[in-house]
Amino acid sequence: MNSTTLPDGTLSAGHMIVKSLEAHGVERVFVVPGESFLDTLDGLYDSSISTIVTRHEGGAAYMAEAMGKLTDTPGVAMVTRGPGAANAHVGLHTAWQDSTAMVLFVGLIPFEHREKEAFQEFDPKSWFDTGAKRVMVLDHPERASEIVAEAMFAASSGRPGPVVVGLPEDIITQAHSSVIHPPIPVASGGMTVDDWKDLKAALQKAERPLFVFGGNDWTHSAAEKFSDWLEAHRLPAAAEWRCQGTVSFSSPSYVGPIGYGRPDYTHRVLDESDLLIFVGTVPGDVLTDGFTARQNWDKDNFIVTIDPSLRGRSGPVTRQIIAKPAKFVDDLVRMDLPANDTWAQWTDSLRSIQENWSALPPAEPSAGPAKMATAMANTVRLLSDDAMVTFGAGEHTNWAHRYFPAEKYASLISARNGSMGYSVPSAVAASLEYPGRDVLCIAGDGEFLMNGQEMATAAQYGATPLIIVMDNQEYGTIRTHQELQYPERISGTQLKNPDFALMAQAFGGFGIKVTEDAEVPQAIEQAYQATRSGQFALVHLVVEQRVKAY
């Protein structure tokens, strides 16, 4: 039975899934189509939801994960059966470690064919149970709307994360006659009276306090109020790895990033501070340099997170405040503290170091091969104040991490699980969500080719990111560690690359290859102007192998 032969007044379960996603505010889904969820695809035909057809399930999952960071609604992807689910798994792992709200719908074999090793059969629960918040399989058509509501709630509640929903092919074509389930309210927590008193007392006692912000569970208004409160009290705040922008790059309270690629001073500050207040994050592996920093039990650590389990946390916990960042900030801004010259001096000293560390290199090119520093300097000068940047994993990320001025919450989008192949899909998602904003994508040669095919998606749907591919002919981060542990024994890290500019042109974008530093400013200008005229653009920047940002 298909949707055209159902009794009057009913919808198929597949169509009801779409109606329920609409009711939850979903505006865009990322799909690689499959026969097993054709009825849901048919429901999308008449839907207000935009269907973005991607070229690989990994790209679809990354785009959905990026949407979970860019918006206050879980990102949604749809793939089919075992092969599609396997390819999408990388995006789920990113959502799990990055605490990103995301729902992956997977078309499954017919219900009656289970456990017979049917074509492309797999067991979603055994595959995903350890890396998803919930794994659900639609077992009755009348539960279609209910299961969407449960999935969206599970992805958003507590510590956000990925949810997997299996859609058996024969179940979604059957009639659904019940009502659309409304969104389930998500608890936001908040400071108790004792939380308030203890935090205020700790701040008043501290001489060198530091806020550390992170995670995806903020709102734009909460980020702005948080920045204003910090500035009013002359208090410093540092960013968790790849979470810049929640406190503006130009804020006098912003003192730099912590984690991989961080400046040395922010690592020292973790131990020098007499009070750390983590908001939306915990002192985990990356933030503490492999569980080495801030492990002394005589220091005060306050942790603000809605996750009572404190998953991934290391070191002492003086007090946990169970609250989402936005609710915590609502309470915090009502806390008025007297002026404190010691705080001001502490903050100003850290801010001065940060300004020096992140100051743009010269825009003027020098003699010799193309340089990433020249490219970043010329690019940043062109970008609007609300520009966004996306990147994946590798040596190329260090330039964006250091020099990109993330002025707004969710203006720096990356994979905190260190997943390669993230840069282009996330840039496409960002450009589609914010078509009026500049979107810069920084990719490495190894990382780019893992999902560079999503340039086709950019061309098909009018996304206009500016992509800079840093080509150092190697897997740079791995090579760096290899040289430290096995000096002068190069094995398995070298690359021979195609002409990425010609690839971009073949996909319908603007592409230019640069080998000399003198060519960089004009190439960046041409590429940027191409994005302003409605094309995606790519600059293939061929640099020296052992190039370093710091």
Label for each model-derived stretch:
Residues V106-E146, C243-S349, A527:
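Glycine-rich, acidic loop regions that bind phosphate or pyrophosphate groups
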Residues E35-F111, R114-Q120, E272-G284, R313, I322, N398-Y475, ...:
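Thiamine diphosphate
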Residues M1-D8, S178, K197, A201, ...:
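Phosphate/pyrophosphate-binding active-site segments
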Residues F122, E150, A154-K205, S358-A359:
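Conformationally flexible catalytic loops at phosphate/diphosphate-handling active centers
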